[in-house]
């Protein structure tokens, strides 16, 4: 994630995808683009949640904001020839949930998760990030717990089986009070999602893989999983995803297909780039996911706007289709 707030990126993505309309007919004909709490028990373990139900093949998707027009947004996913998506919504209400569910059914698109952020300011860097992102900051924690619960209810109304979010810079030191507070908050949210019949997913990025595994095990519920954002691990300088998958693989329920470069400035994240131009080794990671019998979605994410975003998404689709085949 770059400094730009993810919500801003997702808000622009739907409008940008409107530029894809001229290629709808070709896509329908199958013509591919030529472009390339403090009382937790630290001894408990969370059972692994499988992504292999139904043994579906690996399938591609797109992350996007739906704005106030779910039909138009989901139509873009359909016209790209993608069978799945992850969705972000700004406003959570029953009217919008009905329209989103209707659009998903109409176009036969599977929404694999609802992406949740905020409320409040989130700064995507190494200095303000620890103070503003996710459930770690005390000042915004209660409001965000309430917001994620509301999002869980919204997802249930839409028939979406998972809710995911950045939980923040989870402390490396499990002995500090803020770690125990964060685990308690995560347990409360994961428990709420479980009662709604959903999985709760952690988006990788701000924490090291072993810290995330520790938090999952300390929360101790069986509906937790990981949305494995391949580039974020690099952008935050936390791990090479090729190595991280050995720690996180059993928990992976979703993938963000995104590329990036390592940080060169210790104050700023690394740079997100088009797939194939960064440091993510997609062939090795996809091969390892297959060995682990992963059967979830591989969701394309490109954090820019304008015509270049469209070109990069189309190229990523062609490239990834070859790898997941």
Positions of PLM-derived features:
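Acidic/histidine-rich catalytic cores of soluble enzymes
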Residues: 84-85, 114, 183-279
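Conserved, mostly hydrophobic/aromatic
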Residues: 77, 85, 155, 255, ...
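Active-site acidic/histidine proton-transfer and metal-coordination neighborhood
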Residues: 13-20, 68-71, 123-225, 310
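C-terminal segment of N-terminal export signals and the immediately downstream linker at the start
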Residues: 24-65, 76
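N-terminal secretory signal peptides and thylakoid transit peptides that target proteins
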Residues: 1-17
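Acidic (Asp/Glu)-rich catalytic clusters
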Residues: 51-55, 74-79, 95-115, 152-159, ...
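Acidic-and-aromatic substrate-binding clefts and catalytic sites of carbohydrate-active enzymes
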Residues: 64-71, 87-99, 170-174, 205-210, ...
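Hydrophobic faces of well-ordered beta-strands that scaffold small-molecule active sites
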Residues: 58-64, 85-87, 111-116, 163-165, ...
